[in-house]
Swiss-Prot record:
Coiled coil: none annotated. It is found in: Cytoplasm. Belongs to the SIMIBI class G3E GTPase family. UreG subfamily. It comes from Prochlorococcus marinus subsp. pastoris (strain CCMP1986 / NIES-2087 / MED4). GO terms for biological process: urea catabolic process. Gene3D superfamilies: P-loop containing nucleotide triphosphate hydrolases. The keyword GTP-binding applies. Keywords: Chaperone, Cytoplasm, GTP-binding, Nickel insertion, Nucleotide-binding. HAMAP family: UreG (MF_01389). The keyword Cytoplasm applies. This is Urease accessory protein UreG. Pfam families: cobW. Homodimer. UreD, UreF and UreG form a complex that acts as a GTP-hydrolysis-dependent molecular chaperone, activating the urease apoprotein by helping to assemble the nickel containing metallocenter of UreC. The UreE protein probably delivers the nickel. GO terms for molecular function: GTP binding; GTPase activity; nickel cation binding.
Length: 201
């Protein structure tokens, strides 16, 4: 028993990871069968938030308390997350998507290939237009990069043209999109990308 696509969602604290998972679940759930695993160090805050929003039936959202570094729980020792994913796949077989949301981490975050099939890394404009050129596995190696909160660019003095040029250079042809998850801008691009990755649909 397995899901057709396990999708990892990582990024710094406050970049929009949970908002992305919420938005994708709402957009996809009428057509696809979905489950979610969230990660927090000492709580199940993100899972509880999504459950309260009723984006999916409660049993399809599981929170994992990692008790330590968010990066370790998705890379070096992903057993807690792997078990949560397998439990959901057994309970709700067949599934089209399982989203695994990492706890907030730095630019070095990356998922174990044993845990997910592809990864989305989310950064946001409010951190400054220098972020893409700082690189790191999240920027350069993720399957899809999202630069979120583009509506804040003027307020924080970030130049989107600079971010675009730097991202194109750092990504070397890999896909990425500007998004504003609050308004829904760019979400259609993300959905099209994900649906295209699912085999046999």
């Amino acid at each position: 028993m397995s899901s057709k696509l396990r999708v990892g969602v990582a990024g710094p604290v406050g970049s929009g990871k949970t908002a992305l998972v919420e938005t994708l679940c709402i957009a996809l759930k009428k057509r696809y069968k979905i489950a979610v695993v969230t990660n927090d160090i000492y709580t199940k805050e993100d899972a509880n938030f999504l459950i309260k929003k009723k984006i999916l039936e409660e049993g399809r959202i599981v929170g994992v308390e990692t008790g330590g570094c968010p990066h370790t729980a998705i890379r070096e020792d992903c057993s807690l997350n792997k078990n949560a994913v397998m439990d959901l796949e057994n309970k709700y077989d067949p599934l089209d998507f399982i989203f695994v949301e990492s706890g907030g981490d730095n630019l070095a975050a990356s998922f174990s290939p044993e845990l997910v099939d592809l990864s989305i890394y989310v950064i946001d404009v409010s951190a400054g237009d220098k972020i893409p050129r700082k690189g790191g596995p999240g920027i350069t190696r993720s399957d899809l990069l999202l630069i979120n909160k583009i509506d804040l660019a003027d307020m924080v003095g970030a130049n989107l043209n600079i971010m675009q040029n730097d991202t194109n250079m750092m990504r070397d042809g890999k896909p990425w999109f500007f998004t504003n998850l609050s308004s829904g801008s760019g979400v259609d691009n993300v959905i099209k990308y994900l649906v295209a990755q699912i085999p046999n649909i």
